Regions:
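Acyl-donor (CoA/ACP) binding surface of acyl/acetyltransferases
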Residues: 1-35, 52, 69-184
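Conserved GNAT-fold acetyl-CoA-binding loop/helix
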Residues: 32-55
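Short loop/turn motifs at secondary-structure junctions and domain boundaries
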Residues: 58-63
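PAS and PAS-like sensory modules
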Residues: 65-67
Length: 184
């Protein structure tokens, strides 16, 4: 697949690339933002490893994770991904997103997630897309609802590897049929 550039009214989503490390670490290294993430990048070295791994993934023939940076007015303000590795047969994708705290509350996550959802159904051979968030993260749950997803499980749990903290997890889903109906 050719590396896609996704455009919205205000944002550009482009594949993660070498050279993005500093701007990504501004949010990926912020514990206030990443406290609800599986693997926050506590150190700049971890962010560099993340960028290298995801830049290489874009070059891979067997690509399973489509990691984008979210660019607003020339600045990387967040990231989002569609990940197929959560199922053994790669039959569905899981979406995720993160926004620099200085850019929250402006609809950027919803705008990026909607573009990512469109990319996923338009380019990947799947019929379901999931997203999950910590039950204490109403903003992400709101994004899921805004892009047309439906809550399918509110009884899940997640344990964060770096802290050992266990919390509730919400899982939302949208099917290809639902997405197509929503688009008209």
């Amino acid at each position: 697949m050719e590396k896609p550039i996704l455009k919205t009214k205000r944002l550009t989503l482009r594949p993660v690339q070498l050279g993005d490390e500093k701007e990504i670490h501004e949010y990926a290294g912020d514990k206030e933002i990443t406290m609800m993430f599986w693997l926050p990048n506590d150190t700049f070295e971890e962010t560099c490893d993340f960028v290298k791994r995801n830049a290489e993934e874009w070059e891979s023939d067997g690509q399973l994770d489509y990691e984008f940076v979210i660019v607003y007015e020339g600045k990387i303000i967040g990231g989002c991904d569609a990940d197929l590795s959560h199922s053994e047969d790669h039959s569905y994708a899981c979406l995720g997103w993160i926004i620099n705290k200085n850019y929250r509350g402006q609809g950027f996550a919803s705008e990026a997630a909607a573009a990512l959802l469109d990319f996923t159904f338009e380019n990947l051979s799947i019929d379901k897309v999931y997203a999950q968030c910590d039950c204490k993260n109403p903003a992400s749950f709101g994004v899921m609802k805004k892009i047309g997803m439906t809550l399918v499980d509110d009884k899940g749990t997640r344990t964060y590897p770096k802290t050992g903290i266990t919390s509730g997890e919400l899982t939302c889903l949208i099917t290809r049929d639902e997405w197509e109906k929503k688009r008209g």
